A protein has these predicted regions:
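Active-site-adjacent mobile loop/cap segments within catalytic or ligand-binding domains
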Residues: 6-9, 15, 19-20, 86, ...
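Structural recognition of the beta-strand scaffold that forms the well-ordered cores
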Residues: 7-11, 51-56, 91, 95-100, ...
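Mature extracellular/periplasmic domains of secretome proteins
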Residues: 73-93, 128, 181-186
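Solvent-exposed, polar/charged alpha-helical surfaces in well-ordered, non-transmembrane soluble domains
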Residues: 31-39, 43-47, 81, 85, ...
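Active-site histidine-acidic residue metal-binding/catalytic motifs
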Residues: 1-82, 103-108, 113-115
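Solvent-exposed loop/turn segments at secondary-structure junctions
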Residues: 15-17, 58-62, 102-108, 124-127, ...
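Extracellular/periplasmic catalytic domains that process cell-envelope and extracellular macromolecules
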Residues: 1-3, 46-47, 89-92, 111-113, ...
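Acidic, glycine-rich loop-and-strand cores that form catalytic or ligand-binding grooves
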Residues: 127-163
């Protein structure tokens, strides 16, 4: 496959109308933060000559998000349609999809002691597992400052003792977490969803909003995607 044939699709986090997707102090709104990271990742990948699409860029709902379900279910269905239409147009073997989010331990408007980075795939063995492995490699490389931050934060009581910088499940031989998430289960190409620390942990939020944190999160996505393309698509 030629580099010019590769189709990268990036996913933004939930709409602004979806309640509870922010830090307790409102300093971080997942919908805004995700779109900022997506924009930075998209620009960098395009500078390397790749074709990049975003599943949904506006903060608010579209009239095309039709149906009888909840707004969130209609939103997810819309995103999957966008991805699968591009897969049908260009060929799913030429496509990959990475949806970028920020995790939360609760939806109660309170700070919590959870932290860490992780990457989700659908259940079973697919090429998404290989994409997730590349994302984990990039996260380990780019989040060294966060590893030190969590270690210090655990001593100060900002994280519970069981927290680790990288959330993983090695029971099936790789690091990704498998879950029945709609956008990774229903899309036709290799697809992963990253949860980039926790929006309801004070230390995580401070890191995410710092220049160091923002650049690390963007850079790990760029590197993970490029590594996957080099290893499995070109």
């Amino acid at each position: 496959m030629k580099k010019e044939e590769v189709i990268i699709m990036l996913g933004t986090a939930h709409l602004d109308e979806i309640l509870g997707k922010c830090s307790p102090d409102k300093s971080l709104r997942e919908c805004v933060y995700s779109r900022q990271i997506v924009a930075e990742v998209k620009a960098k990948l395009e500078s390397y000559g790749y074709k990049v699409f975003v599943d949904y860029e506006p903060l608010n709902k579209s009239a095309q998000m039709t149906g009888s379900g909840t707004l969130q279910s209609r939103e997810l269905e819309y995103r999957v349609r966008v991805v699968n239409n591009l897969c049908a147009k260009y060929g799913k073997a030429k496509c990959l999809y990475v949806s970028i989010h920020v995790n939360a331990a609760g939806a109660d408007g309170k700070w919590h002691g959870a932290g860490g980075w992780c990457c989700y795939t659908s259940k079973g063995r697919t090429m998404a597992d290989s994409l997730a492995e590349c994302m984990y490699d990039a996260a380990f490389s780019n989040l060294k400052g966060y590893v030190k931050l969590m270690d210090d934060g655990k001593r100060r009581g900002d994280y519970t003792e069981k927290q680790t910088p990288f959330r993983m499940d090695m029971s099936d031989g790789d690091r990704d977490l498998e879950a029945d998430l709609y956008v990774v289960r229903k899309t036709d190409c290799p697809a992963v969803l990253t949860e980039n620390l926790f929006q309801d942990n004070k230390r995580d939020v401070a890191f995410l909003l710092s220049d160091e944190g923002r650049h690390a999160i963007a850079r790990l996505h760029v590197e993970g995607i490029l590594n996957y393309i080099q290893k499995y698509m070109l």
